[in-house]
Regions:
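C-terminal catalytic domains of large/alpha subunits in multi-subunit enzymes
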Residues: 2-99
Length: 99
């Protein structure tokens, strides 16, 4: 969600990174998101001695297009057919107001 709505890497014309710290690189904080219900269903992997396996890598890829497509759908009456990430509040406001 943060990557779709806030996070942006910016370089200047010389290739210098301009968003290299949390001071100028937006990341969502807990207060900015909806409440989440966390459920755990532990299943031990039998293919390695630790019983460990990945837990979130595969699930994060669908979030980006889901958020952006939801915004495009919400703004379709305004003629919006494309929205580049990040869809910051300012970007969405401008699109909603035809700017």
């Amino acid at each position: 969600i943060g990557q779709a709505l806030l996070e942006r890497v910016v370089y200047d014309e010389d290739g210098q990174l301009l968003t290299g710290s949390f001071t100028d690189y937006a990341m969502p904080r807990a207060a900015e998101g909806p409440p989440f219900a966390i459920m755990s269903r532990p299943t031990v992997a039998t293919t390695n001695p630790l019983g460990a396996k990945g837990c979130g890598e595969a699930g994060c890829a669908g979030g980006l297009p889901s958020v952006v497509n939801a915004l495009i759908d919400a703004l379709k009456d305004r003629g919006v057919t494309r929205l580049d990430m990040p869809a910051t509040p300012e970007v969405v406001w401008r699109l909603a107001n035809g700017l």
